[in-house]
Structures are given as structure tokens and as C-alpha cells.
Amino acid sequence: MTDGYYGGTSPSVGNVDGDNGAPYADGYSDTLADVAMEYYENDLASGLDDLVPTTDTDTATHQHMVTYSVSFGVYGTLNPDDYDIENGPYPTWPNPGSGDQQKIDDLWHAAVNGRGTFLSASRPDDLVNSLLSIMQHIESRIASASAVSVNGDELYEKLGADILMFQASYNSDGWTGDVKAYGIDTETGQVITTSYQWSAADELETTNWDTGRIIATYTGSAGIPFRYSSLTSTQQNQLNADPTTAQNILNFLRGDASNEESNGGPFRDRYWRLGDLVHSSPVFVNGVLYTGGNDGMLHAFSASDGSELFAYVPNLVFENLSQLADTEYTHKYYVDLTPTVKYVSSLDKTILVGGLAKGGRGYYALDVSNATSITSETALAGKVLWEYGGDDDLGYTFSKPVIVESYDSSVGAIVIFGNGYSSVNENAVLYILNPWTGAVIKKIDTGVGSCNGLSSPVAVDVDYDQIVDYVYAGDLKGNMWKFDLTASSSGSWDVAYKSGGTPKPVFQAKGPGGAIQSITTKPDVMRHCEKDGYIVVFATGSYLGETDVSDTSTQTIYGIWDY
């Protein structure tokens, strides 16, 4: 803060901004604007990683000074209202040494070079408001930083001669996402975080939204290219009743920015195309990374360079897709579950099965046996196997599927998952489907309901023959269930323990005072090290809704012996 009429000695920094172009450059040395540029351009803490969050106007990631200036009600020869620092016209900066008013212009110039703001306050209340404005600007930068969150665990995979770490993230300021690949220091074994090898979001931005992307969807009976002319009439109307608007929304979803507000259109602005990746962590199989996004798509990225190989839009999320283009968009979930990708030996196929988590009630499956060879939308459409939804026993599909071989030779491989939460019937139910057709082989209903649902299962192979014997899964009522799949006929698969014909859990988790402790995560199972049976390890707790945030009830980690 100053009256602007500085009279100090020269800072001797030179003409630091002289080579920066408009609106930063001038022809004068040792000005206040030069000082601001000196501490903006140079790393003020070179020993730290360059991870400073960026904004639209400040793209520097190194540690730097941002300059905010407030003059005490005095003005220079330039009127800031006559110029647009971001888009032009730009000011021609005068020589600060030629007069006091020119020094005020230099004060504004310093704020421009330092990517801050310039304010003038002629009264005490103006000064207070100016300081509040600066604080709000700083807080918005901090909020932008805190909005960036890492999704899931770090994924380490060997790619050729190198080991890479893949990490997904999302930014709640604009709801965008990214997957980045980082190298590993061969001497220290540490992740090299100062730079990344590729960014999927960056790669997608350079891809032509129309001709460069391979995207498919599903009609309810077959895969189709994600093109307006290929959609069913129902899908077209779900986008919009007006064909032109529906076509434009589909183009927007593919990545067309021409109809965004900043370009004079009716759709919301996006920082970039790739949507937020909140709960769906990347899965690496055969050089490909698969992850679900809340842009309505499952994405397949090349692990070598981050380019998108293809994307899939489940028909299950179609009814809400148009909301992604709404200028009043509030965040929604779409393809939010980590997919399962497994080579199925009995089919000689690699199958991907994914769910929606908070995005809806349903699962989908793709044949990804030769994912890197899919070069057209028609070819991708032919790899869509099935979608499953519309079942009153099926809730929001939080349960991560398991693909295993079974003892029923007429059935072969199976997909197993819990029914999730908030189903119409509200019981805890185990689903067993055919991985190639999506047909229901068996539903095992525990009979325990009233706002219940079965969480992610774990399959146990007791004799190492690559065939599932038992399945464990918890529910919202704190029950840990065991399912017996050892019979050679799927019709005999059932809950392992019963009393008088009524299914009984292995254990029920209860806290102090008998309060039920929900089980929402997959258990781990290991052999007892000295005796028969298995130790089932799991933790309780729920983080599914707003009430869970403030819930302070006691939760517990259990290890139970099932023998």
C-alpha cells in the first residue's frame, strides 16, 4: 500500500520485463514493475517441488511472489478501465522516472507483472473493501489448490524397461479430472514428482473431438457408435427433444467446445474435456489404463503415452447426460466405480465389468481382449457385451465385481457382486451373472432388509484349483455373510450358514450399546496360520451420504475366525 510517489533508490534489477511481450513489457529498467517480475519469474524456493496451483491468469507452478497493490486514492496517466489486460487492448507503459503520475502507472504495472490486482482507495472504507477484495482473491487461489484431490491409491506398473507410477486426480473447481504418469528415480526408488511423463487430460485436449476419438454406447441390446444418427429415438430424446440441440449436446460430450458460453454458446464452460475421476481408480491391464469418469464415460488410455484409445458411454447413464452441458450444472456421478478387468481362461477372453457407484443402478461389460487393436467406433461397438440394470433388488452399484471360474461346468466363469445400496426391495443380495452374456445365473437373497444392501465381495479358493469355493461380503446392517459356491450345480449355491432354513451371518458387528456398525468395504481373507478355517478381516463405517460426514459413532476393525 502506498501513495505511489516512491522516491527510494534504484533496486538494480534491470529491465526484467523487457522480453515478456504485452501486457508486461516496457522499455525501462529498475522499475517497481521490474521488481514484481523478478520475484514472479524466479523460483523463490528451488528446493521445493514446483507444485504451486495455477489459475487462468497465473500459470507459474514454481514458488513465486504475487503482487497486490493499493494506492491511496491517486491515479496515474492511464485509466485501467480503458484496457483489457487478458485480451487487449493493452496499455503502453510510461516511464516511471518522468513524473509522480507515471509512478502510479508503475504501481498498476507491478500488479499486472505479479499476476495480482491493483486497487485505489480514497477513503477508509474503500481501503477496507480493497483489502477484503485482495483477501478474497488469495482465498480463491487457495480454494483452487484445495480443490485438487488425489483419487485412490498410487498404481505402480512396469512398462518396458521402466517402472511408472500412475495417479488419477480430480478438481472440484470445474469438475475436471486427469491421470498422470510419473517416472521413478532408479537410484533412490522415489517417484519423480517435479515433472510428469504424460497427462491424459493434456493428450485429450490435443485430440480432435469428432474424428480423433473412438466412443461407443449401447442401445439395450447391442453396442453402437456414440453418434447422434446411431442412437435410438429414446436416447436422442434423453439428450434433448430438439434434434439440433441434442446433436450439439452429444458433440459437447465428445469434447466440442464451440457451443460453450465463452464461445457464445448455451453450454457450460469446461477447463478441459476429461471429467472428474473421483472414486474410479485406474486399472492397468496389458498396457492399457481403464478408469471411469463423471463425464459419463469409461476411458481407456494408453499407458505408454496417455492417449485415449477409446471411451464407452453406458446406456445406463443416458437420462442424465444432458445435465453435463447445463450452465447451472451441479456435480453428479456417472461412471464412478473402479472397473474389474480379468482374463477368463474358459472363454479365452479378457473381460471388463464396471459399475456406476453413486452414478446409478447397473453394470456393463466389454470385451477388451485386444484393446489396443480397436481402431474404429464400429469395432468398439462390437466389443460391448451387455448392460444389466432395472432390477428391484439392485441398488446403487458400489460393489466391485469379481470374475472367477465356478464348479458348475454348464456355467463356467461367473461375475459376482453385491446388490449395493438403496434398492427397491432393500435386502442384501448376492448376484451371480454370466460374464459373456450378462444373464443372471443366481441371486442369493439373505432375507435381511429394511434399508440394507450387500457390499463388495471377496472370493476364496480354498484348494488352489483356480475355482471359487466361498464368497464373503458385508452389509449395511453390520452382517458379514459367507456364501457357499462349492456345489457342482449353481442351483445349490446358497448362504453358507442357516438356522432352521433362515440365512445366518458369520458375524454381526455392533458398537457400544449394541449400535449396528455398517460394513461398506471388501473384507480380506487369510488362512489361519495354526488351525483350520479362515480369518476374515474387515473394518466398519459408512461414507455414502451427508449424514455420514457428521457421524461420530464408534467404528471397529475386526478379525474373525470362521471355522
Map each language-model feature to its residues.
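A fold-level detector for beta-propeller and closely related beta-sheet-rich head/sensor domains
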Residues: M1-Y563
